[in-house]
Design a protein with these regions (language model features):
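Conserved glycine-rich Rossmann-like NAD(P)H-binding loop of the short-chain dehydrogenase/reductase
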Residues: 25-42
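Aromatic pocket-lining residues of Rossmann-like dinucleotide-binding sites
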Residues: 22
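N-terminal Rossmann-fold NAD(P) dinucleotide-binding loop
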Residues: 15-16
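Conserved NAD(P)H cofactor-binding loop of Rossmann-fold oxidoreductase domains
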Residues: 86-88
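A glycine-rich helix->loop->beta "capping" turn
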Residues: 50-53, 72-84
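The beta1-alpha1 cofactor-binding region of Rossmann-like NAD(H)/NADP(H)-dependent oxidoreductases
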Residues: 58-69
Length: 88
């Protein structure tokens, strides 16, 4: 069964590397960060390299309203793994 992984801070650094590793393992990814352009580039890279299905959710996790929005949006998702990597 394919796992779903949500990674915050996915646009660079450790978060990006987590995304690459889980994509290589065949997981579906939910990528969250502030920069949509970086997330879109990463999603395309992972799709080309591994056929990975990525969902992009842009948000500034330092903002309480955006955290609430994400939680509400993902409340119906089945998450197997959560990587809380967003930095401030």
């Amino acid at each position: 069964m394919q796992k779903t992984v949500w990674i915050t801070g996915a646009s660079s650094g450790i978060g990006r590397e987590f995304a690459r590793r889980y994509a290589k393992m065949g997981c579906c990814l939910i990528l969250t960060a502030r920069r949509a352009d970086r997330l879109e580039a990463l999603a395309e890279e992972l799709k080309q390299a591994h056929g990975t299905v990525c969902r992009i959710l842009t948000a500034d996790l330092a903002c309480e309203e955006e955290c609430t929005r994400l939680c509400n949006e993902l409340a119906v998702e089945t998450l197997d793994i959560f990587i809380n990597n967003a930095g401030f």
